[in-house]
């Protein structure tokens, strides 16, 4: 999920800004409090084998940079360069799903990227599939776990039964066609780098990228793999759009601040059931102690305080051994 900027076509001022902004010092292991280890993460990929030295930079960061700086030119695929996915969605969304879908589509039209953050059980997968049918572009779905591959495949077959779906098997990457004629492609993010090494043009055929469980994919390794994909529209799906380990800075660089957030406001019902059970309270009462610890005054001076300090060359053989192991001044 990146935009492309050709570094040889820009001046040193722009390149210095890129180097500064995309070299992030992240406090690894910082969960709500300080004390983590600082680590520099480079959030870009530079191809020096090409004369123009193209560089893949985070999606939203690239769009924002080009918008605020007239001298910057970025590459993002045009709709006319991509195929059309015109398959029909046969299901029906709930009212809250329809509202969130419309809000997300509006944000994608205006900002090209957003996050769909809804509570667990909301139906984010179905909503995203419906959005893909509205955008009408070949869709790449990146998931962080293997079980999610089959889950997405089943949901697509259920709601868009006429769609052609390709699930990338890492053991069969070499047999994939260079120009996949499919409506949906589902891949484990860990296998993206292997796929791009085999055929860099494969991922360029998709105009809509859906990043499932986005909070799990905002890590150094997975973000590096996702930089290979250059979509026209980007959607992140997560119920928890944050991280406590320092990598939260990647959210804004890739997806931006725009978010559709739906919270669960359902009231809980509490039922009171009479069981007739009466516990024996005497079993849980604290038992009285049969002895009392002596007070501090009655103990006197502790033995370890009454001993003289250990000095080198005096005392027992154990003392001399301990003293001889000290590092010299």
From Swiss-Prot:
GO molecular function: ATP binding; DNA binding; helicase activity; hydrolase activity
Origin: domain of life: Viruses
A Pfam family recorded for this sequence: ResIII
Amino acids binding ATP: 118-125
Helicase ATP-binding domain segment(s): 105-259
Disulfide bond residue pairs: none
Keywords: ATP-binding, Helicase, Hydrolase, Nucleotide-binding
PANTHER family in the cross-refs: GENERAL TRANSCRIPTION AND DNA REPAIR FACTOR IIH HELICASE SUBUNIT XPB, RAD25/XP-B DNA REPAIR HELICASE
Family: Belongs to the DEAD box helicase family. DEAH subfamily.
Protein's name in the database: Putative helicase 109L
Source organism of this protein record: Invertebrate iridescent virus 3 (IIV-3)
């Amino acid at each position: 999920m990146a935009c492309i900027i050709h570094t040889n076509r820009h001046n040193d001022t722009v390149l210095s800004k890129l180097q500064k902004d995309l070299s992030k010092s992240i406090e690894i292991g910082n969960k709500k409090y300080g004390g983590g280890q600082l680590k520099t993460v480079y959030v870009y990929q530079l191809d020096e084998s090409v004369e123009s030295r193209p560089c893949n930079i985070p999606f939203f960061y690239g769009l924002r940079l080009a918008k605020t700086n007239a001298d910057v030119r970025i590459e993002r695929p045009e709709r006319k360069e991509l195929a059309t996915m015109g398959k029909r969605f046969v299901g029906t969304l709930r009212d809250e799903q329809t509202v969130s879908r419309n809000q997300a589509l509006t944000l994608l039209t205006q900002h090209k990227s957003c996050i769909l953050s809804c509570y667990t059980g909301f139906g984010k997968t179905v909503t995203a599939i419906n959005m893909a049918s509205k955008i009408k572009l070949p869709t790449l779905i990146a998931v962080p776990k293997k079980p999610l591959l089959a889950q997405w495949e089943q949901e697509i077959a259920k709601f868009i039964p006429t769609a052609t779906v390709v699930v990338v098997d890492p053991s069969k990457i070499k047999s994939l066609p260079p120009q996949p004629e499919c409506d949906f492609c589902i891949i484990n993010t860990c296998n993206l780098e292997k796929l791009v090494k085999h055929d860099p043009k494969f991922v360029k055929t998709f105009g809509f990228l859906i990043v499932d469980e986005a909070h799990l994919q905002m890590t150094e390794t997975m973000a590096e793999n996702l930089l290979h994909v250059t979509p026209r529209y980007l959607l992140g799906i997560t119920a928890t759009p944050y991280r406590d380990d320092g990598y939260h800075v990647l959210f804004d660089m890739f997806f931006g601040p725009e978010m559709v957030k739906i919270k669960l406001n359902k009231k809980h019902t509490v039922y009171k059931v009479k069981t007739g059970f009466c516990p024996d309270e005497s079993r849980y009462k604290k038992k009285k102690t049969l002895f009392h610890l002596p007070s501090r005054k009655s103990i006197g001076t502790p033995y370890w305080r009454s001993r003289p300090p250990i000095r080198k060359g005096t005392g027992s053989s154990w003392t001399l051994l301990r003293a001889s192991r000290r590092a010299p001044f």
